[in-house]
Amino acid sequence: MKKVLLTLIAVLMAVPAFAIEVYNNGENAVDIYGTLRGYIGYGHGVDGVSDTTDDNFLYGIQGNSRIGVRLKVGNFSGQVELGAVEATLYGRSTGSNVGLRQAWGAYSFGNAGALLAGKTDTPTAMGGFISDIMDTDGGLNGFGGSTTGSRRFQIQYNVAGLSIALIENDMAYGPGVSYGYTDGGETIPRLGLSYTYKNPSLLVKVAATYSALNGTINAPVSDTRWATVHAFGVALGLKPTFMDGKMWLSVLARYGMNEELYGEAKTVYNGGLMAHSSIRNYVGVQADGTVDNVQRAAVALELGYNVNDMIAVIVGGGYQHSMIDALTYDVGSYAVFLQAPIKISGNFALIPQFTYTGTRLDSDNKDSLVLAMQARITF
């Protein structure tokens, strides 16, 4: 079995990148695709309050390793994709197991657009702007970036670069709320929309989302009072390219409130690991119905240059300011990274990255250095 696996990897490294075409007659097509992502590295974390340090040898397979099938039958298209670690239906109940990343079908009306139903990325997922590989290719989310993937069941309409979606509100995808609420609650379907413009030298995306949660207050005594938590986010991404595409500059900005309700923004620190750790990842509601809102403003930048067909150099960084009503101080988190992707073949790449992060919580400072390399096989 080991010999077969090594042979398969060698074959993938030797050929250009392409999905495996199972069937194609022009009108109808089926292909298989996938990616396997592993990492190895070293991390060093410092906790300023306890004056302790952590040194970590890092290795593993990333949870966004995946395999999928795409199909097209006339005006109908669809996709089914399995991820190594993916919440499928009710979030945490399947959050550490293999699950469905994509499961959707769409019908095209030609110039009138397309209607999609199923699980796919929401319009506010902002992939393609920041190349950071930390936190499962998280794009500096929590350190100035924005979520690169937010897969939910939804009904989505797409036309001429515009996407409008009604999205399921499965609270298990995000930590939700704490204090004052019963286990139940009433949510409205989350609304998401975006507009994307793309040509060979420019990528622009503007996105926004809104949701709300109503719940009965159960402290100090149960009654019929209701409190409402409003949640929203807006994001802007801009990525022009220069020198016939050899150089690019990405600018990404996001502002939102109470995005814990749907899990697209977070306040974090890094302890010298590939994954980040959350800081107060819930919205609090007091006994009188007062909502302890969590607001975040974030910005990230990336500059990249393709030295040749094999090697690129990328430098990036970001800053996020979190304003949490329940705390007496704000939280500032920032990161910088240097990356040098090496394209061994069309199917295989090595991506070394050096990252420094810092998080400031009143008098508590948390800093980290991580040097890691991702190995990525794609077909």
Q: Across the structure, where does each feature detected by a protein language model lie?
A:
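Outer membrane beta-barrel
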Residues: 21-42, 54-172, 185-187, 192, ...
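Gram-negative outer-membrane beta-barrel proteins
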Residues: 40-50, 86-90, 123-127, 170-176, ...
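Repeated loop/turn-to-beta-strand initiation elements of outer-membrane beta-barrel proteins
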Residues: 75-79, 111-116, 160-164, 201-206, ...
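Detector for outer-membrane/organellar transmembrane beta-barrel domains
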Residues: 197-338
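Hydrophobic, lipid-facing positions within transmembrane beta-strands of outer-membrane proteins
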Residues: 63-67, 100-105, 151-155, 160, ...
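Transmembrane beta-barrel strands of outer-membrane/channel proteins
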Residues: 34-42, 80-84, 117-121, 164-168, ...
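Outer-membrane beta-barrel "beta-signal"
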Residues: 342-344, 366-379
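Cleavable N-terminal export/targeting peptides
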Residues: 1-29
